[in-house]
Amino acid sequence: MPVIRLPDGSERKFDGPVTVAEVAMNIGAGLARAALGGKVNGKAVDTSYLITDDADLSIITDRDAEGLAIIRHSTAHLLAQAVKQLFPDAQVTIGPVIENGFYYDFSYKRPFTPEDLQKIEARMQELAKRDIPIVRTVMERDEAVAYFQSIGEQYKAEIIGSIPADQEISLYTQDDFTDLCRGTHVPSTGKLKAFKLMKVAGAYWRGDSNNEMLQRIYGTAWAKKEDLDAYLHMLEEAEKRDHRKLGRQLDFFHMQDEAPGMVFWHPRGWVIWQEVEQYMRNMFREFGYQEVRTPTIMDRVMWEKSGHWQNYHDNMFTTASENRDYAVKPMNCPGHIQIFNSTLHSYRDLPLRLAEFGSCHRNEPSGALHGLMRVRGFTQDDAHIFCTEDQVKDEVADFIVMLYKAYKDFGFNEVLVKLSTRPEKRVGTDEAWDKAEEALAVALRQNNLDFELQPGEGAFYGPKIEFTLKDSLGRLWQCGTIQLDFNLPERLGAEYVDEDNSRKHPVMLHRAIVGSMERFLGILIENYAGAMPAWLAPVQAMVLNISDGQADYVSSVVAELRKNGFRVDSDLRNEKITYKIREHSLQKLPYLLIAGEREMQTGQVAVRTRKGEDLGSMPLSAFIERLKSDVADKV
C-alpha cells in the first residue's frame, strides 16, 4: 500500500502500485488532463511511471519549467517522426532540448530546404492532432542494438555503445516511430500544441569535423499558442535590432573574413566605446581602484605556473621567438598577481584593487563566433581585489553597489542574481568555503537582493555571484560576476605580511561589471535598437541648414555646441530639408537642429527629437541646457 506524499504536505494511500497518471486523476480530472509528467522523490518520470513504494510526488504541468522542457523534448521526437515518414532514407541521431526550443540532427543525402521544413512542420501538426499515445519500453542492450541495426539506424546503435553499462536502455514509441531516449515525454502527441520549425544548419556528428556533416533542424515549442506568438514577435524585433546589421547601417563597426572574431571599430562606434570605458574608469576611481596595464604576450612559463597552459591551451593563441614559447593572454589575472608580487605587502595595504581594460584573445571555434557577442579579441573591464578573508563581505557589498549603479545608468533596471557554491572537487578548507559563501550571501542580503542559490556550481577555486541583465525584449545576458579565488594567489606565490608577522596568501576576487566590452556594446546596441541615449550617442545633434544663406550661422551653432562639450555635426549640402531630415532620422540621432532664415535672425534653432517630436524653435542656450540635462540624467 504505497503512501504518496504531495507538495502541500497531504498524503494519499493506494491499495497497490499506482501510476503518476492515476494519482493525478485521484487528485482531480483537471490535473490529470494537464499532467505532462511527474517528479517521484525528485526524479522526473513519465505519467505512466509505476510507483510501488511510499514516495514524494509532484505532478508536472505546463506551468512548470520542467513541463516546458518535456514539451520541447517530445516535440523533437515529433519532428523526427515526421522526417522519417517524409524522408524514409534519413537516419536519426540526437535531438536535445536547448534554450527556447530544440533541435534534431539527421543524416541525409542532401540538405533540407525551406520547402522541406514546411512539409515537415505540416506533418508534425497532423501527428499532433492524432493524439498518438507515447509508450516507454526497456530493452536489453544487445537487443536494442540489434533492433536499431535492423531498421537501418546505425547512429542509434552507436549511441547505445556509449551508454554506461549500469544504465537501462529505454525506448519511446509513437505509432510507427521508435526512438532511443532517457525521457521524460508527454503522454501523447496531442499535448504538443504550439511549435514551429525555425531553420536548418549543418553540424558534425559528435561535434567532430572529421565525422559526417549532418542536417540540424531547429525548432521552438511552447505550452500555448500565445507564448509561441510572443516568442516569434520577440524574434522579429530582435532581427530589427541585430547589432551586426545596425553596426553597418549606423557606421559603428564592421567585421571581415581576414580577421575572424576581431572588430574594426569606425569613428562613431569608437565614440560609444570610449564613453563606456571612461564611465567605468570614473567608477574605478570613485570606488578606490588603481588602473594598471599588463603585457598582452607572456612566456609559457607564466601560463604553466597559472595552470592555463595545461588546462586552457587549446583556447590560447601561441607564438614563438628566439627559442621561447609565448601565449597571448586569454585573461588578465596572472598579470595582476605579478604586479601584486612586485612589492612586499602588509595587511595594512589590503584591500588592494587593481583594474585594467585588458585586451585578451581566445581561440574560439569559428562556428561559435557571432558578431560582437562572441569574438576572439576582446577587452574586459577587469579588476582583481586582493584582500583578507575578513574583508571579503565588505568588498563584495561595495562591488554590488558599484554594479547596480552602472547597470541603472546604462538603462538596465532588472538584474537576476545567482550564487554558486562549492563543488565536490575543490581546493581550500571547508572552513574557508563556509566563510566565503556566507560572506557572499550576507553581502547580497545587505543590498536587499533576492538571489538563486546554485549548489555545487561554483568553480573549484571558490564560490561566485553572477549577475544577468534583462534587456528591452526580455532577453537575458549574463555580464557581471564576482568570483572568489583561493587557488591562484597560492599557485603564483602572492603573499602579504599579517599582523602576527606571518606570511599569508590573500583572497583574490575576480570581478567584472560589463565583462567583454565588445559584447556589452552589442547588448547596448540591441537594447536601444541603435538609438543610443544622448550621453552615449556618437553624434548628439546634427545641425541642418535650409538654404546656403544659413551656412555661416550653422557653423557658429556647431562651434558653440562643441565648446560646451557636445558631439555635434552639420549637413550643409544643397538638398531639400525634408530629404536631409529623413536621411539623418535613419541614423537614430537624439536631435536634429534646423536653422532657417527666421532662426538665424533670432539666434534660435528648430528642434526635432529622434522620435519625430517637433519641439519648435528655442534659443540655442535653452537647447544647450536641455542636452546637458539629458546627458546628466543618462537619457
Curated annotation (Swiss-Prot):
Signal peptide: none
Entries under Gene3D superfamilies matching the protein: 3.10.20.30, 3.30.54.20, Anticodon-binding domain, Bira Bifunctional Protein, Domain 2, Threonyl-trna Synthetase, Chain A, domain 2
GO molecular function, one term: tRNA binding
Oligomer status and interactors: Homodimer.
Cofactor: Zn(2+)
EC number per UniProt: 6.1.1.3
Binding-site list for Zn(2+): 333, 384, 510
Subcellular location: Cytoplasm
Reactions the enzyme catalyzes: tRNA(Thr) + L-threonine + ATP = L-threonyl-tRNA(Thr) + AMP + diphosphate + H(+)
Function summary: Catalyzes the attachment of threonine to tRNA(Thr) in a two-step reaction: L-threonine is first activated by ATP to form Thr-AMP and then transferred to the acceptor end of tRNA(Thr). Also edits incorrectly charged L-seryl-tRNA(Thr).
Species for this entry: Methylobacillus flagellatus (strain ATCC 51484 / DSM 6875 / VKM B-1610 / KT)
Record region (Catalytic): 242-533
Gene Ontology CC, one term: cytosol
Protein name: Threonine--tRNA ligase
SUPFAM superfamilies for this protein: Class II aaRS ABD-related, Class II aaRS and biotin synthetases, TGS-like, ThrRS/AlaRS common domain
